[in-house]
Amino acid sequence: MCDEDVAALVVDNGSGMCKAGFAGDDAPRAVFPSIVGRPRHQGVMVGMGQKDSYVGDEAQSKRGILTLKYPIEHGIVTNWDDMEKIWHHTFYNELRVAPEEHPVLLTEAPLNPKANREKMTQIMFETFNTPAMYVAIQAVLSLYASGRTTGIVIDSGDGVTHTVPIYEGYALPHAIMRLDLAGRDLTDYLMKILTERGYSFTTTAEREIVRDIKEKLCYVALDFEQEMQTASTSSSLEKSYELPDGQVITIGNERFRCPEAMYQPSFLGMESAGIHETTYNSIMKCDVDIRKDLYANTVLSGGSTMFPGIADRMQKEITALAPPTMKIKIIAPPERKYSVWIGGSILASLSTFQQMWISKQEYDESGPSIVHRKCF
């Protein structure tokens, strides 16, 4: 196990994207969509070698003839057969490694059901025959990646947003808040408000175009009302975007109305609190003695925190909720899109971590429930 040339594999399975690579690297080698596609129609050409399923980018590029499924919904695995296909694709096609030769570090959503952790463990040892594995909570890894062990992580990806207070490396489960509002919802909302402007985006293929518009042009306003005023009186906030067919569309207040839904979920017809309130509520559920450390170490993580302006807005909103003299610091690392993976890479390469792995032998002796004793 202590062999230097046997690098651990780090796999961060998100609702939208899977990030995978080798421990010790500073970025994931493979980043691909967490999708499995199956042909909608029977193949008519004999001997074309049509496959019964496609994964990731290949599924994405053939989406016109496939039915696409996301096996991870709101951060939690709901379809294990498809999940197995994604892992198989990760090891054999993307990383080109034999999983039976490397320890594997997987990530999980906060509050992941116990049965799910056991199932992950079982698949790794029984299907892929890994020599060792470990399951780490995503938000905790993001915090490690920022060089901290105490703080509150606002982790927002494609399928779910969590606010996770962490003290000395341990997530505090009673104070974790989950918000089913993330990147996919913002893309859908942008599709809806662009339709109001007279542009029609409806298919799954067009949704990808809108996702690109969102990633390239959207930003978070510091003062929403004031920004709306500016947008209505001048064209200074308008930007144009060229569609794949050459048509150019103009987008104005949609640029900041879309991510505003994170602060005002009522825009999406949701009754929940915005991410700033969720963060505050999480902090208030923690022991009074550690709140100061959480306010001063508020870390953003995940692709849906990549909007320009989000850190300043977060600072403003939390300052308004917190006690007046409180020092509030929002940390927004530039690589936060991949900070869960980076944290995993750091953790799996620490010498002190090597005794933490669940070995095949321990699994054979105790069964899948070993994961609750060794990973927390």
From Swiss-Prot:
Modified-residue entries (N-acetylaspartate), positions: D3
Write out the GO cellular component annotations: cytoplasm; cytoskeleton
Q: Which residues are annotated as modified residue N6-methyllysine in the UniProt record?
A: K85
**tRNA processing is among the record's keywords:** no
**PTM (free text):** Oxidation of Met-45 and Met-48 by MICALs (MICAL1, MICAL2 or MICAL3) to form methionine sulfoxide promotes actin filament depolymerization. MICAL1 and MICAL2 produce the (R)-S-oxide form. The (R)-S-oxide form is reverted by MSRB1 and MSRB2, which promotes actin repolymerization.
**What EC numbers are recorded for this enzyme?**
3.6.4.-
**Entries under InterPro entries matching the protein:** Actin, Actin/actin-like_CS, Actin_CS, ATPase_NBD
**Post-translational modification Tele-methylhistidine, affected residues:** H74
Q: Kindly name one Pfam family recorded for this protein.
A: Actin
Q: Which residues carry this modification: N-acetylcysteine?
A: C2
Q: Which Gene3D superfamilies match?
A: 3.30.420.40, Actin, Chain A, domain 4
Where in or outside the cell? Cytoplasm, Cytoskeleton
User: GO molecular-function annotation terms?
Assistant: ATP binding; hydrolase activity
List UniProt keywords, sorted A-Z: Acetylation, ATP-binding, Cytoplasm, Cytoskeleton, Hydrolase, Methylation, Nucleotide-binding, Oxidation
- Please, which domain of life does this record's source organism belong to? Eukaryota
Which reaction(s) are listed as its catalytic activity?
ATP + H2O = ADP + phosphate + H(+)
Methionine (R)-sulfoxide is found on M45, M48
What does the UniProt record say this protein does?
Actins are highly conserved proteins that are involved in various types of cell motility and are ubiquitously expressed in all eukaryotic cells.
Q: Which family does it belong to?
A: Belongs to the actin family.
Q: What is this protein called?
A: Actin, cytoplasmic
